[in-house]
Amino acid sequence: MKEIVIKTDKLTKRFGDFIATNEITFEVVAGEIFGFLGANGAGKTTAMRMLCGLSKPSSGQASIAGFDIYNQTEQIKKHIGYMSQKFSLYEDLTIKESIQFFGGIYGLTDKQLKEKSESLIEQLGLKDQTKKMVGDLPLGWKQKLAFSVAILHHPKIVFLDEPTGGVD
């Protein structure tokens, strides 16, 4: 039997009288690629934010990696990577500081962080750029860095919000 890693049942998010997501129900099994398609304002980002534990649903149920989105959000965050459409990077940090910051959030040990930082910097071809401010990077580099820090801790599930916007 295939492992269900995301399961929703009538997941709804309201902002006052406005319904951003209306009773969405689906399942995603391990290894499956799943995507939301829709016009701007259709609720794709809202749905992802609920699934990542960043926004509380108005009603419905969901579990991510076996954890309930209402009362196990911290456990969910340890098992997912999330790259928002704004890249979730701090413009006033250097490349190296960004990697260390996100590694710390994901609970990597100092040893893991050192190894992963060096490996990531090498893979991205940024060895001579580690002191460069994120705000000074071209959009494509920001996107590569944002994706890289989202998967730094080898999450079970990765959420990508508009992952191809601005790719060179």
Each predicted region: which residue ranges?
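Conserved ABC transporter NBD signature motif
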Residues: 60-68, 75-76
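Conserved ABC ATPase "signature" region
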Residues: 100, 104, 111-129
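Conserved ABC ATPase signature
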Residues: 133-140
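Hydrophobic anchor residue at the start of the ABC signature
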Residues: 147
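Catalytic Walker B motif of ABC-type/P-loop ATPase nucleotide-binding domains
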Residues: 158-161, 167
